[in-house]
Amino acid sequence: MLSVIRVHLPSEIPIVGCELTPYVLVRRPDKNSTTDDVPESAPLEGYFLRYRWYRVQSDKKVTICSVHPTEQATLQCVFCSKRRSLVPKSYHCSPKCFTDAWQHHRTLHERAAAENNANEDDDLNRNNSAGSGSLAGSLSGSMSNLSIANNGPAPFYPSNITQKNGGETLVEVGGCKTYTPTADDISHVLKFECVVANAETKQIVGHPSTILTSRVIPAPSPSPRKLIPVNGADGMGHLDQDARIQSAGSFTVLSYNILSDTSASSDLYSYCPPWALSWPYRRQNLLREIVGYRADVVCLQEVQSDHFHEIFAPELDKHGYQALYKRKTNEVLSGSTSAIDGCATFFRRDRFSHVKKYDVEFNKAAQSLTDALIPQAQKRTALNRLVKDNIALIVVLEAKFGNQPTDPSGKRQLICVANTHVNVQQDLKDVKLWQVHTLLKGLEKIAASADIPMLVCGDFNTLPGSAPHTLLVMGKVDPMHPDLAVDPLNILRPHTKLTHQLPLVSAYSSFVRKGIMGLGLEQHRRRIDLNTNEPLFTNCTRDFIGTHDYIFYTADTLMVESLLELLDEDGLRKDTALPSPEWSSNHIALLAEFRCTPRTRRG
């Protein structure tokens, strides 16, 4: 007969909006064990599995700490408590919790004061009156405005909860195997029940197998990143559906390495809470972030093949995006093709139509290079060094929106978008440079045939000032560049061949163009390295901080209108590094708004 062996949840901490899928191991009538579902519609020898989810409701309300969601709140910031949008961020589990989080928490006060009226600005000054603007002084002032949360002691993992016993009641909230917590579940424990039932009588057979979760927590909500105009206009805009500052004829491009699930190991990112590192949570948080940017073109890296087909393509399709994908060429981990990641490019169907797609496999280029230039005795060594399974996805799109320059035939504007993920191994400087040069040569051919604006996006795994970065933005590499010393296969010689004719410029260098002023621009210039004109970082982990991600564009056909604001390192360090509960990748998203300009002939 059918029986349940055991059940458990991959994550003990349920989050609002994040689907819970229990692991259920059953023994079939033939004595074999399986995790396959046995629904009422397909019973086994007259029996099926019945599922129930319950909310454990208590007469006692429990409030959760906004910084440590597994802890009960004991303090509340008075300033935040009076502003509805900040209430979820107002709770803290201890004075130390509030003190440690103050550097980030203070920015919430400042942002609220700036975005609302002068009265709130006065409140901020009163709250911080004990200091002169220093961290210690400001914190002292706000500590005096903490209130004690009216919550008695309550165990984090309740035990022996039964229906209508001791002020607690079970409220059925779901009848499927999976359940997605709602806002009504916040601060409550959930109970999952799995039991074998008779298909004919519907009667329960045996005892149910149950799990109690910890208390449901709200999904962390990072402060929205703003779109900063860099074309001389004053002001800042939100990237929301009802108030986009994007003007007619312009378009936005997003580039984001989302950190594949196979790469998100607890060993590498032990500082990130397990629930925030789990794929079910990160998936939901990444989708919410990506959809929220409402970019016209989205370039993602490290998208696993199964996640593209099962999650990203169908979910973004609901928001009007068409999807294109190129996976890497080698299998990883268990050898499953689903574990291979790649590059995914999405575009809004109401803004663009698909014209052409090019797949770039650096492995094939490596094979051709080896066959042509490497002596037979060195071919195996050369292939071992060059074959790294990296790829690029190039798409040509036709604009559907107005106010775009057209060619003499009257056709709408074409735009070429390259999305790539270059080799990560830092010692293979020659391989990185060769991959970037190979991509640029391919883009040059497309540009020569169509003479269209070009965008080159992705994770290049190379720092500003490196040989690959220099080649991209300068069109050549100084023969004395130190990176060129690493060339055991002589694939970079002669160095004079390391050139290209595309007038590429990094979009984020627009933050430091002379003569451009605007609200908030000076603040964001401080997040740019003035030696390289690139962001101080796009990748921030415990052991590394630096810039690996870029959006390049051809400056003779495109101009930058706006840029997505960069993140502040101090704000990220409150969670040690990335990924974190608020930001679910070890990289940050980059986004730029462009406008096509009248073509000038490339010489």
UniProtKB/Swiss-Prot annotation:
This is Carbon catabolite repressor protein 4 homolog 2. Its cofactor is Mg(2+). Its main location: nucleus. It holds the Pfam family Exo_endo_phos. Mg(2+) binds at residue 302. The keyword Cytoplasm applies. PANTHER family: CARBON CATABOLITE REPRESSOR PROTEIN 4 (PTHR12121), CARBON CATABOLITE REPRESSOR PROTEIN 4 HOMOLOG 2 (PTHR12121:SF78). InterPro entries: CCR4/nocturin_mRNA_transcr (IPR050410), Endo/exonu/phosph_ase_sf (IPR036691), Endo/exonuclease/phosphatase (IPR005135). Belongs to the CCR4/nocturin family. GO terms for cellular component: cytoplasm; nucleus. Keywords: Cytoplasm, Exonuclease, Hydrolase, Magnesium, Metal-binding, Nuclease, Nucleus, Repeat, RNA-binding, Transcription, Transcription regulation. Acts as a catalytic component of the CCR4-NOT core complex, which in the nucleus seems to be a general transcription factor, and in the cytoplasm the major mRNA deadenylase involved in mRNA turnover. Component of the CCR4-NOT complex, at least composed of CRR4 and CAF1 proteins. Its EC number is 3.1.13.4. It is found in: Nucleus; Cytoplasm. Residues 126-136 have a biased composition (Low complexity). Coiled coil: none annotated. The keyword Transmembrane does not apply. It comes from the Eukaryota.
